[in-house]
Design a protein with these regions (language model features):
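N-terminal regulatory/effector-sensing and dimerization cores
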Residues: 30-138
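General N-terminal leader/first-domain-start detector
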Residues: 1-42, 47-52
Length: 138
């Protein structure tokens, strides 16, 4: 499963709905509308083959929300412009202005996001095909 398909599957199972592109987001990626029952806002993702993806979160939850996601193997780096919550494995606070990273593919990413606080972030995930093969070949 490719990067784009992974996020499309996870987001739609979580209630997000793919929507038309907006002038606020690059049309090269896919834009998803948050599930209206639990959140308000958008999730944008652009995947480049099996090399990397770029994600933008811009939504908030109506209630404190627990997220559990088994990511493919990758190095994930995210800057949070706005957030309030906790990463659970290992425990770390999520606060505005922080940069968080994790190495995915081994255990589920688990976090709690607090209600009515915007989750605004930009992240990149770099996959083994990029840092083990693509860069070496260049």
């Amino acid at each position: 499963m490719g990067i784009s398909e992974f996020y499309e599957d996870w987001l739609t199972r979580s209630g997000f709905v793919e929507t038309k592109s907006s002038p606020s987001y690059c049309p090269a990626g896919k834009l998803y509308l948050a599930p209206k029952e639990v959140a308000c806002g958008y999730y944008w993702v652009y995947g480049e083959k099996n090399l990397f993806d770029i994600k933008i979160h811009d939504f908030y939850f109506f209630e404190d929300s627990f997220i559990s996601l088994n990511t493919p193997e990758c190095l994930s780096i995210t800057y949070y412009d706005s957030v309030s919550g906790e990463e659970l494995t290992p425990y770390r606070r999520l606060t505005a202005g922080c940069v968080k990273s994790f190495y995915g593919g081994h255990e589920a990413y688990k976090a709690i996001f607090h209600k009515n606080i915007p989750v605004r972030s930009v992240g990149i995930e770099v996959f083994p095909a990029y840092y083990e093969n693509y860069l070496r070949e260049r």
